Amino acid sequence: MPIANATTVHSDIDHGTKALYSKITWRLIPFLCFCYLAAYLDRINVGFAKLQMLEDLQFSTAAYGLGAGLFFVGYIIFEVPSNLILQRVGAKLWIARIMITWGLLSACTMFVTSTTQFYILRFLLGAAEAGFLPGVLYYLTMWYPTYRRGRIIALFMIGLPLSSVIGGPISGWIMGHFDQVQGLHGWQWLFLLEAIPSVLLGILTFWALPNHFQQAKWLSADDKAQLAADLAADDAEGKDSKHSFRDGFFNLKVWMLGGIDFSILLSAYAMGFWMPTFIRDAGVSDTFHIGLLTAIPSLAALAGMLMIGASSDRHRERRWHIIVPFIIGAIAMASSTLFSQNLVMTVVLFAIASAAIIGAVPVFFSLPATFLKGTAAATGFALACSVANIAGLVSNSLMGVVTDLTGTSHAALWVFAGCLILSCFLVIALPAKLVNR
């Protein structure tokens, strides 16, 4: 009888804990996912705008690549300061500020008439968005213990592929149907209309996000006590974690993570910004059809995120859930250069590459919080993202220059595939106690 009673109590506790985290997830993750969707859409819609604006404004492909890349200069410079401010003023205020300003600046791109204006606005857009992704990742560490974060980060980050699944067809439709409406080009309407959700979501942030679980009115006192106990136990398991700004900034493991993420983003941004061009080069001219086809690799990335993140949490293993997808993605991306005129093979290979490379991203982003806490976590998340986002400048600039020199945008993909393979050695070098929690 005592054994039966103990089993019943244990079952009740497990059920209560599951219900608690389910409640938190339904309250936070859908909203944050839509925010990330809006952010990434405003970041990469310039890839669709390129199909019209280069001819309208007489920009070269290299000028477009530089402008697309300058976003990341502003992003890199302001990433760490932005995340430290978020830690000081709270997620609610700072995420709202980020979203409203990036939405307004993205809309202003519709008024661009010169390369200088394009460069300035892309830089300012990067500065405005800086801190959003690492800020949300840091925010989630205040709600979920380490062993739950792989799946949760995957659920949050499905906003990334969803931005292309939803945004691709919508972007193509806007450019095709709004061209010359009220005397504006389709690409101008694109920047205006797709900025509106960011501003509206930024305003809603004031009501949707508590700064801390202790401020969540929808959690009971027992819920808060359970959550505090879970997070305290998680902190005890990572008792060697670092806490200060210095610990985050001068930690070799943070810089290693930045190098790994750099390799991820070289490929992710090449696919995100240039996928419409790859599909057009394979023989598709209609912008709406291009938008529909760009959704296929993004759907594959969404499935990859959910499956790889869930598997990693279930096995409490991170290293091989990163390495194996990297190898598969590198092979698929390099192979795509051999079929650049074949539409079916182009879409299939980029779908495989997207599912593997982007699918591993949530697992990767669960690593910093295994050895960083507090200010060090805020600094470490932002620093790793800052180092990595140099890839945005390198990727877009290299793609633009290579296209102007060779007439094709595919040659640079070999470089990006090689970087993914090299980053596998950095993953192997990370201590097992960090990658298997």
UniProtKB/Swiss-Prot annotation:
Topology of this chain in the membrane: Multi-pass membrane protein
The species this protein was found in: Pseudomonas putida (strain ATCC 47054 / DSM 6125 / CFBP 8728 / NCIMB 11950 / KT2440)
Protein name: Putative metabolite transport protein NicT
UniProt xrefs under PROSITE patterns: MFS (PS50850)
Chain's gene name: nicT
Primary residence: membrane
Signals that turn on the gene: Repressed by NicR in the absence of 6-hydroxynicotinate (6HNA) inducer. In presence of 6HNA, repression is alleviated.
Keyword Transmembrane helix: yes
GO process terms (BP): catabolic process
Subcellular location: Membrane
Pfam family, one: MFS_1
Protein family: Belongs to the major facilitator superfamily.
Transmembrane segments: 28-48, 66-86, 93-113, 123-143, 152-172, 189-209, 254-274, 290-310, 320-340, 347-367, 374-394, 411-431
An example Gene Ontology molecular-function term: transmembrane transporter activity
